[in-house]
Curated annotation (Swiss-Prot):
Signal peptide: none
Residue ranges crossing the lipid bilayer per the database entry: 36-56, 86-106, 120-140, 172-192
Top-rank taxon: Eukaryota
Subunit structure: Homodimer and heterodimers.
Organism: Populus trichocarpa (Western balsam poplar)
One GO cellular component, as annotated: Casparian strip
Key words, A-Z: Cell membrane, Cell wall biogenesis/degradation, Glycoprotein, Membrane, Transmembrane, Transmembrane helix
One record GO biological process: cell-cell junction assembly
Keyword Ribonucleoprotein: no
InterPro entries attached to this UniProt entry: CASP/CASPL, CASP_dom, CASPL
Name listed for the protein in its UniProt record: Casparian strip membrane protein 3
Length: 197
């Protein structure tokens, strides 16, 4: 009795250079969560830039008119209005939070299935969005008042005289609304990453 098995050798040229068509399946379960975490980090960096730009732009908003009298100098500055002061402080807090949240976003990339950092980010992002929206809404009301005035109160708009001041303030408000939109999108991404599937 022989334990020998004869296997015919295929010596054709076509069979020698081909590899088997069966590939190993390396599908990682939850791979989309890592992709969401990377997208979260990129958006978070964008939100830092826009929130910081809004705070810095409003904080440097001032204009002095070239004409003045012996007793008066006509000047407009962000610290003349408490609403703009609140805007600068609130946007600085939001941008500071966003910088401090970057390590948690990196942890979410390294450990995409961890729910603790995601839950913390979704709660604090909601607080930051609320503060950002409050500051932006208050500032847009003052910018509108500066541009159009209020005929009922007999207030005239000042943007005809202080054009640079109004332009910089409007730019800061637009940047803050962009930051609010990015924060809202970050909350949606965190909610998607917290799903069980």
């Amino acid at each position: 009795m022989s334990a020998r098995v004869d296997i015919p050798a295929d010596t054709s040229a076509a069979a020698k250079g081909t590899a088997p068509l069966i590939a190993a399946s390396t599908h990682v379960k939850g791979g989309y969560k890592k992709g969401l975490a990377i997208f979260d980090l990129v958006l978070r960096l964008g939100a830092v830039v826009t929130a910081l730009a809004a705070a810095a732009t409003m904080g440097t908003t001032d204009q002095t008119l070239p004409f003045f009298t012996q007793f008066f100098q006509f000047q407009a500055s962000y610290d003349d209005l408490p609403t703009f002061q609140f805007f600068v402080i609130a946007m600085a807090i939001v941008s500071g939070y966003l910088v401090l949240s970057l390590p948690f976003s990196i942890v979410a990339i390294i450990r995409p299935h961890a729910t603790g950092p995601r839950l913390l980010l979704i709660i604090l992002d909601t607080v930051a969005l609320t503060l950002n929206t409050a500051a932006a809404a208050a500032a847009v009301a003052i910018v509108d008042l500066a541009q159009n005035g209020n005929s009922s109160a007999n207030w005239l708009g000042i943007c005809q005289q202080f054009g640079d001041f109004c332009q910089k303030a409007s730019g800061a408000v637009v940047a803050s609304f962009i930051a609010a939109g990015v924060l809202l999108f970050l909350i949606v991404i965190s909610a998607l990453a917290l799903r069980k599937r």
